[in-house]
Amino acid sequence: MPRLILIRHGQSQWNLENRFTGWWDVDVTEKGAAEAFAAGKLLKDKGVLPTLAFTSLQTRAIKTLHLALEAAGRLWVQEDKDWRLNERHYGGLTGLDKAETAAKHGDEQVKVWRRSFDVPPPPLEAGSEFDLASDPRYDGIAVPATESLKDTIARVLPCWEEKIAPALRAGETVIVSAHGNSLRALVKHLSGISDEDITGLEIPTGQPIVYELDNDLAQVERYYLSER
């Protein structure tokens, strides 16, 4: 039976500071690193051991993956880094304090930007301090100026179809270390969650979510490993 492990990166510095992060590259905090290592230890203790790994091009997800694999005794597994697993791009909100943004624009407007399915935040200005167009990791990639959750799903699902799903069908136990919104995309697809309901799904940092799938990759069971 194919098995998929999803893990959101451990707490990042901007999670701690309550800032919009998106594609900007911030590191995990000491707490975030501990969350990642604890997740890997849980994988080892429960015997849920990945044989193949996928992650984004962002440090917080990559480091979470490595710490979890180290704790699980699985640093040797092959990993694939794919930009399509990056967090949703928060456009012109990138770097802003969430509370200050709400005070400036109003709670309802910020809620629409954060939690609507298909309304993106204002675009990031070209040449701003958070413009990643010249970042070497994105050579050949059209870096978005902003994204809605719908936009994020539209890039995550081809990664699923091209890479992750074939690996599961081939018998791999796959771990995906990614971000709140890129993981929402996978959960929505696998669990058949509606556009409206997926926006309210919270995915905690550093907590492995396990999918037991049938041979057609339909969900048999979904659970937090810590609850088993």
From Swiss-Prot:
Keyword terms, alphabetized: Gluconeogenesis, Glycolysis, Isomerase
Active site positions, chain numbering = H9, E87
Q: What is its EC number?
A: 5.4.2.11
Per the record, the GO terms for biological process are: gluconeogenesis; glycolytic process
What's a Pfam family this protein contains? His_Phos_1
Query: Could you cite one Gene Ontology molecular function of this protein?
Result: phosphoglycerate mutase activity
Q: Which pathway, per its entry?
A: Carbohydrate degradation; glycolysis; pyruvate from D-glyceraldehyde 3-phosphate: step 3/5
Please report which protein family the annotation says this sequence is part of: Belongs to the phosphoglycerate mutase family. BPG-dependent PGAM subfamily.
What is the name of this protein? 2,3-bisphosphoglycerate-dependent phosphoglycerate mutase
Annotated organism of origin: Novosphingobium aromaticivorans (strain ATCC 700278 / DSM 12444 / CCUG 56034 / CIP 105152 / NBRC 16084 / F199)
